[in-house]
Curated annotation (Swiss-Prot):
It is found in: Secreted. Heme binds at residues 32, 75. Can bind free heme and also acquire it from hemoglobin. Conveys heme from hemoglobin to the HasR receptor which releases it into the bacterium. HasR alone can take up heme but the synergy between HasA and HasR increases heme uptake 100-fold. It comes from Serratia marcescens. The keyword 4Fe-4S does not apply. Keywords: Heme, Iron, Metal-binding, Secreted. One of its GO terms (molecular function) is metal ion binding. Gene3D superfamilies: Haem-binding HasA (3.30.1500.10). Induction: By iron depletion. InterPro entries: HasA_haem-bd (IPR010495), HasA_haem-bd_sf (IPR036912). This is Hemophore HasA. The keyword Kinase does not apply.
Length: 188
């Protein structure tokens, strides 16, 4: 699946970095740390208790701001390496209001931004060093650094970065990755 971005048109002029910074400051840190784990700050999986096709959580600061991670995700809990999320991360959606999860897929009720075709993966043995764990746990902690690093790696193929606006990214991804020897560029 090719990388894609969908967004509310009001965010078209925002850079990805600025949007994620705004989202993180609103979402906050759910404080899912040793000694502080509760149902409210643990989120949930669609498809199983510790694994599934989605992981989602709402902010503990405002109970509204949320994100949904899609792919094939598994959480180790006490299996080694303990407390590690791994697998395939294909999509991320951000916005307000979270529905579903028990008998239906999670969805954001008021979506802001979604990224598809992320194609990020980690093995269980990578533990907390795996990109899937770093991105999702980072978001749970209100830290978008790992996600921005991953997005920069993807956007570099389009000559863009997280400092590019959503409108710029959408235009570039609609055209696709162009290589110097692409027939489209040679004909120009």
């Amino acid at each position: 699946m090719a990388f894609s971005v969908n967004y509310d048109s009001s965010f078209g002029g925002y850079s990805i970095h600025d949007y994620l910074g705004q989202w993180a400051s609103t979402f906050g840190d759910v404080n899912h740390t040793n000694g502080n784990v509760t149902d409210a700050n643990s989120g949930g999986f669609y498809g199983g208790s510790l694994s599934g096709s989605q992981y989602a959580i709402s902010s503990t600061a405002n109970q509204v701001t949320a994100f949904v991670a899609g792919g094939n995700l598994t959480y180790t809990l006490f299996n080694e390496p303990a407390h590690t999320l791994y697998g395939q991360l294909d999509s991320l959606s951000f916005g307000d209001g979270l529905s579903g999860g028990d008998t239906s897929p999670y969805s954001i009720q008021v979506p802001d931004v979604s990224f598809g075709g992320l194609n990020l993966s980690s093995l269980q043995a990578q533990g907390h060093d795996g990109v899937v764990h770093q991105v999702v746990y980072g978001l749970m902690s209100g830290d978008t650094g790992a996600l921005e690093t991953a997005l920069n790696g993807i956007l570099d193929d389009y000559g863009l970065s997280v400092n590019s606006t959503f409108d710029q990214v959408a235009a570039a991804t609609a055209v696709g990755v162009q290589h110097a020897d692409s027939p489209e560029l040679l004909a120009a």
